[in-house]
Amino acid sequence: MSSPEKVEPQRAILESFANPNPQRDYEIDMHCPEFTCLCPKTGQPDFADFRITYVADEKCIELKSLKIYMWSFRDRGAFHEAVTNQIMDDLIAVCDPRYMQVQGAFYVRGGITTTITVEHHKERSTEA
């Protein structure tokens, strides 16, 4: 099990492809309902439903690579907050979107559900 302080990224798994319509803003919504990682305190599995919504710039996320990337967390210990932010950071590094929201809705553990939502807005140039 990985150290709870750091989620080991599998960024190299992620792939992108050229956005077929970069001149237009359009929303891409991906749903990953079978996410699993390990609780860094107990080693027990944590299950989550991830929703990734973004507006692509020049690149889009390739779906098969996203699936394999999300599966790569199955044997990793990670706090909910850390893993959600790591997923956001890795996706931004791969596709540099105009906008992205990553939401991880973790299933009940000890009578408590946790939902972590992170957003990214790309800074646009103000030059004319």
From Swiss-Prot:
It catalyses: 7-aminomethyl-7-carbaguanine + 2 NADP(+) = 7-cyano-7-deazaguanine + 2 NADPH + 3 H(+). It is an enzyme of class 1 (oxidoreductase). GO terms for biological process: queuosine biosynthetic process; tRNA modification. It comes from the Bacteria. Its EC number is 1.7.1.13. Pathway: tRNA modification; tRNA-queuosine biosynthesis. One of its GO terms (cellular component) is cytoplasm. Pfam families: QueF. GO terms for molecular function: preQ1 synthase activity. Belongs to the GTP cyclohydrolase I family. QueF type 1 subfamily. HAMAP family: QueF_type1. Catalyzes the NADPH-dependent reduction of 7-cyano-7-deazaguanine (preQ0) to 7-aminomethyl-7-deazaguanine (preQ1). This is NADPH-dependent 7-cyano-7-deazaguanine reductase. The lineage of its organism: Bacteria, Pseudomonadati, Pseudomonadota, Alphaproteobacteria, Magnetococcales.
